[in-house]
């Protein structure tokens, strides 16, 4: 069987979960640290209405900046997120079948669910969870979402997060992300991951670690915090959540620049968590929950 390219992995997962009944959404157009931060997860996992979606989410973690020199750690990467609410009884079986669709022979490889309960301090979110290992390498995170914004979820959602780069490294048998086959073409049309993303990786690493203006970031954090609170008061939880995401990203940039102390870091986490909570509470209020 021909090894899937990076984009074929995405298309295969989209088709698989579409056939199951998920709506295929688009990435959220904001700086987020993981697919979980998409409002399709944070807000829609709350309340009593069923919700089944899947989407790719480009994600940023400034603290993982390596100037494009690390074989598998980047400040920008891609996740494929699946939310099944309520979580079906056979969710693990569904996940394993998705791996088979990607060409992974479950009988020939060691697939393990390693207990790893998940939490996001800035989102005030938590759930029972497992890392999924394939021959000793983590390729996915599996979580039963129980709390978001400090609010208990009425219906427990099953969240599956595929680490697309790690999955592609495994499927293609390659050691470095930049060498991944992006489009499955040959000759002049062939593209590697590095040709698509690694100049941006180099430049944004320099920005994240060297050029991000700390005073400006501090101002932007405070402005985002205040704007979020004003929008919640105005019954606009969706734009308010955008500013919560902005505040979270500015906090991550400040952290990557080494500007904030350990004590200050805890304070910033609480501030972002408060913003997430008031957005979630207002969303539920306006949804009639």
Swiss-Prot record:
One of its GO terms (molecular function) is glycine-tRNA ligase activity. Belongs to the class-II aminoacyl-tRNA synthetase family. InterPro entries: aa-tRNA-synth_II/BPL/LPL, Gly-tRNA-synth_heterodimer, Gly-tRNA_ligase_asu. GO terms for cellular component: cytosol. Tetramer of two alpha and two beta subunits. This is Glycine--tRNA ligase alpha subunit. Its EC number is 6.1.1.14. Pfam families: tRNA-synt_2e. It is found in: Cytoplasm. GO terms for biological process: glycyl-tRNA aminoacylation. It catalyses: tRNA(Gly) + glycine + ATP = glycyl-tRNA(Gly) + AMP + diphosphate. Keywords: Aminoacyl-tRNA synthetase, ATP-binding, Cytoplasm, Ligase, Nucleotide-binding, Protein biosynthesis. HAMAP family: Gly_tRNA_synth_alpha (MF_00254). The keyword Zinc does not apply. The keyword Aminoacyl-tRNA synthetase applies.
């Amino acid at each position: 069987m021909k090894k899937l390219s990076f984009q074929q992995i995405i298309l295969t997962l989209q088709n698989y979960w579409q056939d199951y009944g998920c709506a295929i959404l688009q990435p959220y157009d904001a700086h987020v640290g993981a697919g979980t931060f998409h409002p399709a997860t944070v807000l829609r996992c709350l309340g009593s209405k069923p919700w089944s979606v899947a989407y790719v989410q480009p994600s940023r973690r400034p603290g993982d900046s390596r100037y494009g020199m690390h074989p598998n750690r980047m400040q920008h990467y891609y996740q494929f997120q699946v939310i099944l609410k309520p979580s079906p009884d056979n969710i693990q079986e569904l996940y394993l079948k998705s791996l088979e669709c990607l060409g992974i022979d479950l009988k020939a490889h060691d697939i393990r669910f390693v207990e790893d309960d998940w939490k996001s301090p800035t989102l005030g979110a938590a759930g029972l969870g497992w890392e999924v290992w394939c021959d000793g390498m983590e390729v996915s995170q599996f979580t039963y979402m129980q709390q978001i914004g400090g609010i208990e979820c009425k219906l427990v959602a099953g969240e599956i997060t595929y680490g697309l780069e790690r999955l592609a490294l495994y499927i293609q048998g390659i050691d470095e992300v930049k060498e991944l086959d992006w489009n499955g073409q040959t000759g002049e049309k062939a593209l590697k991951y590095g040709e698509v993303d690694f100049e941006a990786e180099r430049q944004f690493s320099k920005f994240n670690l060297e050029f991000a203006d700390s005073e400006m970031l501090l101002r932007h954090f405070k402005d985002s915090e205040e704007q979020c609170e004003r929008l919640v008061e105005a019954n606009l939880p969706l734009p308010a959540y955008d500013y919560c995401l902005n505040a979270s990203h500015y906090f991550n940039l400040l952290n990557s620049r080494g500007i904030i102390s350990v004590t200050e870091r805890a304070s910033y986490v609480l501030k972002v968590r408060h913003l997430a909570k008031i957005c979630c509470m207002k969303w539920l209020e306006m949804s009639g929950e």
